[in-house]
C-alpha cells in the first residue's frame, strides 16, 4: 500500500475549468444512507462566502454499483469507492442526469476514464458554454455513452425514470432526470434523495 500525503488525497488538478471554492482541494465524505444499498459521496463547492455540499449517489444494482451525479475523482473519492467495490462489485453505470449542471459534468470525463468499463447514461440535450462542443471534445467518451429515454434507460427492473423539463434557456436547455428506486422506495432528484 502506498502512503500518500493527506492533502494529495484531496487534490483535484482540473479545478481551473470550474474555479469554485475550495479550488484544488476537495475533501470527500462517504455516508451510508440505506445499509448495503445506497451511499452518498459529498464534496464542498462554493462561490464567494457561500459553500454548499454537492453529492454523488451510489446505488447497489445487479452485480455492481451505479453512480448518479459524478464528482471530481480525487484519490480520496476513489479510495472510498474502492471500499464499496470490494464488497458490492464494480461500477457498472454512471448517470449524468442534468443537461446544464456543470458541477457534475466537470468530473465525468476523469471518472469515466477510471471506470472505463462502465456504461455512461446522459440527460438529453447536453450542451457547453461558450461554445457548444461535441461530447468527445468535452472528454465524455461517446462510444460508451447513451442518451436517457432516446436509447432507453438503465436497470429498468429496479428503477422508474422521469424527466423534469426540458425548458429552453436560449443557449441550451434545462433538463433533469430523476429516478425512483423500487427496492428501497427512494426518489432521487438532482442531488436530493427522498426516503
Task: Specify the residue positions occupied by each region the protein language model found.
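Active-site metal-binding motif and surrounding structural segment of the metallo-beta-lactamase
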Residues: 74-120
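Conserved beta-strand hairpin/beta-sheet module of binuclear metal-dependent hydrolase folds
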Residues: 28-79, 175-181, 186-191
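Long, non-catalytic terminal segments
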Residues: 2-43
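Generic beta-strand structural signal
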Residues: 91-93, 116-119, 157-159, 175-177, ...
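Short, flexible loop segments at the rims of nucleotide/cofactor-binding pockets, characterized by
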Residues: 16-19, 44-48, 67-73, 96-97, ...
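Metallo-beta-lactamase
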Residues: 125-176
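Conserved small/polar residues in nucleotide/adenosyl-binding loops
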Residues: 193-195
